């Protein structure tokens, strides 16, 4: 299993981990060249002689957080996601897609969801646009577990929906780009 460590591992961007069930699989990870002109070359990664500072920082972040820290953080994130999900469920102009655990995708049948995304962005929220169906998603992280965040999101989501309703044909922001890209019948032709 592989995982990037910057969101939930609390490490800097640029690191990932590859987890093996046991040593028998991990041994295939190594690159070994016995014929290299510089001598025997062994590397545990594709990157070869890449500096180890990011790996060391990742290791330090994971050791500092510890198993119990990760368990506690996971619990807080899942609780925050429940609160944010309730906010989305309570907003009549948007609807959740699927039955999400912590990555909350939602769409709208009444307003341009990408305009909602743009307005939320102006209010400091980092959501990503999705297509087919037109939707946006919020990836719940530990930052969303702070007190009052769900209430602030409820306030900002309601204001963003109203702004999208009031300016349905605005040409600024990401809404026009997402709308146009989502309308291509053959996406690979772009």
Question: What are the residue ranges of the model-derived segments?
Answer:
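Active-site C-terminal subdomain of aminotransferase-like
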Residues: 1-102, 106-111, 184-187
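Non-catalytic terminal extensions of PLP-dependent enzymes
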Residues: 71, 90, 100-101, 107-190
């Amino acid at each position: 299993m592989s995982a990037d460590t910057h969101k939930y591992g609390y490490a800097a961007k640029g690191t990932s981990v590859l987890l093996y069930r046991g040593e028998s699989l991990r041994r295939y990870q190594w690159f070994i060249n016995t014929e290299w002109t510089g001598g025997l070359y062994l590397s545990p990664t594709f990157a070869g002689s890449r500096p180890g500072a990011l790996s060391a920082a990742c290791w330090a972040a994971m050791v500092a957080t510890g198993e119990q820290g990760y368990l506690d953080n996971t619990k807080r994130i899942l609780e925050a996601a429940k609160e944010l999900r309730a906010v989305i469920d309570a907003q009549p102009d948007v609807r959740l897609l699927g039955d999400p655990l912590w990555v909350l995708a939602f769409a709208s049948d009444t307003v341009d969801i990408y305009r909602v995304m743009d307005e939320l962005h102006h209010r400091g929220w980092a959501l990503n646009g999705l297509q087919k169906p037109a939707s946006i998603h919020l990836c719940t992280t530990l930052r969303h577990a702070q007190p009052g965040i769900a209430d602030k999101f409820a306030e900002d989501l309601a204001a963003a929906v109203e702004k999208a309703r009031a300016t349905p044909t605005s040409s600024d922001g990401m809404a026009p780009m997402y709308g146009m890209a989502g309308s291509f019948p053959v996406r690979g032709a772009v």
